[in-house]
Amino acid sequence: MSFKFNSGTFEDNTFNEQIRDRLTRALNPSRFENPESTSGQDGSDSQKKPKKLDILKSGVTVRQVDFRTIPQLEILDLDVSAQSKSLLKGICKISCKDAMIQITTEIEANLLLLYEAVSPEFTTPKLISNDSFTVPITMTFDHIELEAITNIFVKNTGVGISFNDVNLDFRFECSMKLLQTSIEKRLKNSMETIFKDVLPSVIFNMSQRWFTHGPELVEDPSLIATDSALSEVTPMTILDDSDLQDLSPATMLRLSTLISSRQSLALNPISSHTVATIPGCIERQNLRRFSSRIPSLNNYYAQEVGKHRPSKILPTRENSNSIIANKMASDFIQNSLPTEVLESGSYNIREIANIQQRIYERNNEENVIRRRRIRLGKRSKSVQDTAAKMHPVPESGSLHPIIQPSTTPAATVTPLLSPQPVVAKSPPESMTPNTLPEQSPYTSNIAIDKIPDLTLPQAQLQKDKVPMRLNLLEESYFKSDLKDLRNSLYSPMRNQRFYVQSEDGARPSLLDGKRFSFVGLANQQMKWGNDDLPPPYKAN
């Protein structure tokens, strides 16, 4: 046995408007609550309110309902009882294709609960916004295909229906693409509740006007909570561990990068006199980490307190935009030493003093720490006086400095003294540069009378009659062949000017065919006596 619906009912769009209105009332029972049905004789029923979702800022509104194809109904079984109260029982098969429903609502984005009233003023930064903000969201269910077996009970007061063997498929689109996968998964898990509670109540309320012509709305007692304790909103989990797997890793990486780039836990940007994007402000997502790093005794002894004190569960809030002044949370914000630490004697006086000093330094912004200055090139008067006593300055009339002999014992190692050239002698006549006019760039304009006479240190020591040990270099200094070579190489003079021998000129026959070499004197790491560089010897 089967029948068809009247096509005219679906063409004039009156049926769609009725379905849209009934779905809106079913999804928002608190907005369309009948005051007569909730008021009792003793007034106890007036406190019974339906459960309200904390995440929703406003109610759910059904904006559009469209049945593009006419639904089909097939009667599988029918039982009519002839009693004073007429009763009709039947089993039907309902099939619906290509339907569309669009709903809108607003969710509240207030993920942090701030205890600003109980936090110290000097450690609590200025918040840009402490209020919640609403985000509109639109959800569209398109291409809905439904096949279900229903049990129908028809009385003279209304129509009751129950769904069995439901097969549902639809395409879901959300205005917030980040939450689309998570919402779609939750909706598919909650479809059982929709077909067991929501749709039967909607159909029953619609049938009241058809059968009794009474008031359009009769609340189902099952939708009203019987316990007043249900009025308190329990905390909800927005995202489970299974939901995190459905989120896009690329999107989560972008969000984490954006959040980490905006975090700032330093106290310098919080001060009003420093340069910052928003002076004296901190972002709300950083407040919890900022408060946990504030130097206080409770933060330092938090682990010790947690061993003796049971975990405290903060009370939940009815609305997400309300702020609760929690007294239990204030115990952990105040700078006081816990009683558990005093009883166990596990405190440290130095740590307590350091924490108090850090709090004072952070609170006192006018305390400017002076930087340490280091001056180079100057010595104090005491150091200069001691240096003058140890090494007296010679008289201005003396041109040659006199080396003071040391009074160290004989066992000490004597310093190495470099051989110095004797008084410069005039070069032989054979080396006069009369035939070399092109070597004028290599000559010097220093006059002879301005050059001081060079005196050996050993000769000066002999005048003072101070015995001193000679090293190998000083012993070889007094040999005759080295004297002649040194006189010719150190200060050759031509026409009262210093002259540097060129490679083209004639070489003096001083060595007489003998080989003479120096090993290791040209190395920069070695030093020739007290001079930085060795004398200008040339390689053969």
Curated annotation (Swiss-Prot):
GO function term, MF aspect, one: lipid binding
Subcellular location(s) per record: Mitochondrion outer membrane
One of the GO BP terms on file: phospholipid transport
Subunit structure: Component of the ER-mitochondria encounter structure (ERMES) or MDM complex, composed of MMM1, MDM10, MDM12 and MDM34.
Known function: Component of the ERMES/MDM complex, which serves as a molecular tether to connect the endoplasmic reticulum (ER) and mitochondria. Components of this complex are involved in the control of mitochondrial shape and protein biogenesis, and function in nonvesicular lipid trafficking between the ER and mitochondria. MDM34 is required for the interaction of the ER-resident membrane protein MMM1 and the outer mitochondrial membrane-resident beta-barrel protein MDM10.
Domain notes: Lacks alpha-helical transmembrane segments, suggesting that it resides in the membrane via beta-sheet conformations similar to those predicted for other outer membrane proteins and porin.
Protein name: Mitochondrial distribution and morphology protein 34
